[in-house]
Amino acid sequence: MPKLPIAGDEDWSVLTEPPLLRGLPGFAGKFIPMQQARELYQRVRAAPPGFRLEALLAEMKINFEVQLSDLDRIPVKGPLVAVANHPFGVLDGAALAVLLSRARPDVKILTNSMLESIPELHEHCIFVDPFRHSSSSYKSVDKNVKPLKQAMEWLRQGGALAVFPAGEVSHWNVREAQVTDPSWSDVAARLVRKTGASALPVYFCGHNSARFQLLGLINPRLRTLFLLQEFLQQREKNVRIRIGKAIPSQLIANLEDDEEATEYLRLRTYLLSHRGKKPFSIPTRMRAALPRKPQERIAEEVPSRFVVNDIAALPAERLLIENAEFAVYAARASELPHAIDELGRLREITFRAAGEGTGRSADLDQFDAYYWHLLLWNKEKQELAGAYRAGETDAIIRAHGIKGLYTNTVFRYDEQLFLKIGSALELGRSFVRPEYQRQYAPLLLLWKGIARFVAAHPETPVLFGAVSISNEYSSLSREMIVRYFEQRRVKDEDGREFADLIQARTPFRAPKLRRWDCGALCSLLRDLEELAEPISDLEEDGKGLPILLKQYAKVGGRLVGFNLDRKFSDVVDGLVIVDLRQTDPSVLERYMGKEGYAGFCRFHWLSKGAR
């Protein structure tokens, strides 16, 4: 039978002196501090019931290093299976139980039946026989029926259960050339799927000593022998713990089988080991060592009255949409003699705040002269709150050729691309000022403004442009986003055809993180929302996906290529293509408005409500 997930495995069992120790009295007496262990045990057992695991950690002067935001991720009620890697032994089980109990009182650990002889552990544990290879394996199956039923009943009553699916302590894996858990049992996944419990990934940073790993290579039983000594050497240790977002039971249930669910839980757990990591990359390090060109000082603010006059002078038909607070206008740069300078200044301020930006005093370029500018205007404060830049590809290519498109600076296009997608509207340089980013309404109105612009120009039903993934995201987050869309593009015939006509000028290549298979996790994700959760786990500030990426996905966008923009703070640009004729009708009507949507449908001979 597969080895069951436990806490501590054989760790505490040395206190009951199993045959291995009794058979090696001289060796054990020389290398294993049994007397020290017994004295610790006596002090811990004197603690009040319910506090003995805390007493154990207190006696050892072990401290947790865990972010408060991570502690807030522990569900305070409802059935919960906390899954964790198992790097140390005794320490892991005690630490995880105490950590969970700070958020909720109903915590138990699935642990080794050898520890059942220690009565003080009964209040904390459900005991199972973990061994998979023994002459008594069938007896183990019988012995585990009752405790596993007990575990399921505990979860169905709304309790929390701590599980170490590896079933034994992490050790050196020769094939992977690192210390890691052995393969995980599927028991944790089965408990989640059978009880409807949420799953909580928890990662312990670190591992046991090099001597422990070496002894395990000589004989795995030597690891067991020295687990107690390893624990006693953890005195005054600071244990770094990372907690991921709780995984809804339905997500686990939707995976194909217990094996796939187990793989997902393991990947989500080990993903936490990369939070905040900056992978080693020789080119990146070399660039970092070079003197950087200093950023220019931000341009002076344009006097408000000049900007107000520019907006007031726009023809009435340039108003695309408005609500009580904001209005969205369409204008050419020639109609904005003062406002265009303020627009460039605000762009640069906003992009710099997001770790991007040109480094110039204002973000203005040659494309601004002949592109449309969709302006988000705060009616009460009389100020620009954000903007989009939009260009009709047919007109631009006629006047300037393909090189007249902004995205041609980051992607090389085959002329066949524009024959395939037809008349389109290139979007880019979008921003909402930082002080307006706390609410979603400004960006939503901008998007409605884009839709109204398309409704007024229905001959351009395709949107395309570059959506940025800033370098404020970790390299692994950016790689996961890229890999997710690349995997889906392979399955999308149109996406593959588009990709064949596009070439990134500087292809994005993520620095490799040793022994992490990014594609394995991405292949288990069904939609963009399921990608957002692991991204949030990776990012130290907990941010999810870039909001524009989600917005494009909502209207059916395909990401067909990725480029690293060296001139724009090393952001990753994803080239997105959206055919609004294929967008969900209810979504499109919400953005275009009923009249605009009806006119769009008439122009393209679309039946309302059908794609």
Please identify what each model-predicted range represents.
Residues 107-143:
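Conserved nucleotide-cofactor-binding alpha/beta core module
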Residues 366-375, 543-544, 569-574, 587:
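A short helix-loop-beta-strand connector motif used in the catalytic cores of GNAT acetyltransferases and
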Residues 320-373, 377, 385-389:
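Short amphipathic alpha-helix that is part of the acyltransferase structural core
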Residues 1-86, 93-95, 102-106, 122-123:
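Membrane-anchoring hydrophobic helices of lipid-metabolizing enzymes
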Residues 382-387, 425:
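Glycine-rich phosphate/pyrophosphate-binding loop shared by adenosine-nucleotide-utilizing enzymes
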Residues 2-7, 141-299, 513-522:
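Non-catalytic C-terminal accessory region of glycerolipid acyltransferases
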Residues 293-334:
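Conserved N-terminal entry element of GNAT/NAT acetyltransferase domains
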Residues 348, 358, 394-558, 563-573, ...:
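Acyl-donor binding region in acyl/amide transferases
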